[in-house]
């Protein structure tokens, strides 16, 4: 998959230098405009494709809708794994998301509760599919460019959280607290309007700055497509560390957030809506902040933010210690565990490691490949990583229901 007009030499650089561009030794062949516009385009795609998810979190909308969205993401990843998704679908997927956002505004104003609930269930599945296809295409395109843009895509996903969080805080000060179907009417209207504007901008920038037309495929890419690549089994053996790391980080994050923290914390300790906004905001802000240092690892101060996949796997297993911490925050009534500052620190640490460990695999996997050197094979592995991310999210959000079988929520009895 080609990206820009000058990206036809991508795999020569990848094969021969294995990431020299990142250190600046190989020299960039992109123009000054491309050096700004391409990263911005991928950031915008990541931002807009995840805004709907973060809007649902910000509105504290029914948790089951989130599970249906993740199910849609997995469906899209399965499609991408067995079917070569045309690059031209990227702007159409983003356009579909924009239309679904408009549908939320109409449904909330005009439908009955049962109709709105049905629309949400269907729409969130389709949103998951559309967002998944957009992210799969963008990651596949970005990771095979002359300069790896996968990290910028990941950064855009992180920006979405803090972007929606800030808008949420501003709207809390401006709009009335009038609710319909237990959702703030004005906030839903404005948040989805902002989602639509971001998606329109993403469509414009992707069409103008990315080479999405298959008719303009370079000779080198045509030759690469005809050339026999490695089998799926060989590619899995070559990239299993990156795939496993991607699965683990997303599985744990979605198992604990938002199902245990903040949902079960709120049930146990009657946390106010404002404090819930702060806790959710901690995840969004620190997930955003942590996605940038790995992209700046060419600077000495940020050098330790990227490391080998072996170290990343070890850190992912250590990250399992968040499970008892989150459970205790729900199950224990001691002042330290009901303290909002401690809860925010807990959520911030989960979020920081989530964004950080999600970004590293896309930046380092190419250098650690032993057999896969062709562009076609690297595109396939990039798709594997996106599939691992979505399957991890899917397994995480559905296994969060396991905690319903344990008495971790403190029962509050009302005295008559």
Swiss-Prot record:
Transmembrane segments: 36-58, 65-83, 88-107, 120-139, 149-171, 188-210, 242-261, 274-292, 312-331, 344-366, 381-403
Catalytic activity: inosine(in) = inosine(out); adenosine(in) = adenosine(out); hypoxanthine(out) = hypoxanthine(in); guanosine(in) = guanosine(out)
Phenotype upon changing residue 367 to K: No significant growth defects in adenosine-dependent proliferation assay when transporter expressed in purine auxotrophic yeast strain
Renumbered residue ranges of the record's region Disordered: 1-28
InterPro entries noted in UniProt: Eqnu_transpt, MFS_trans_sf
Phenotypic consequence of residue 178 to K: No significant growth defects in adenosine-dependent proliferation assay when transporter expressed in purine auxotrophic yeast strain
Additional note from the record: In contrast to the human transporter SLC29A1, has low sensitivity to the inhibitor nitrobenzylmercaptopurine riboside (NBMPR) and dipyridamole.
Name assigned to this protein: Nucleoside transporter 1
Lineage, broadest ranks: Eukaryota, Sar, Alveolata, Apicomplexa, Aconoidasida
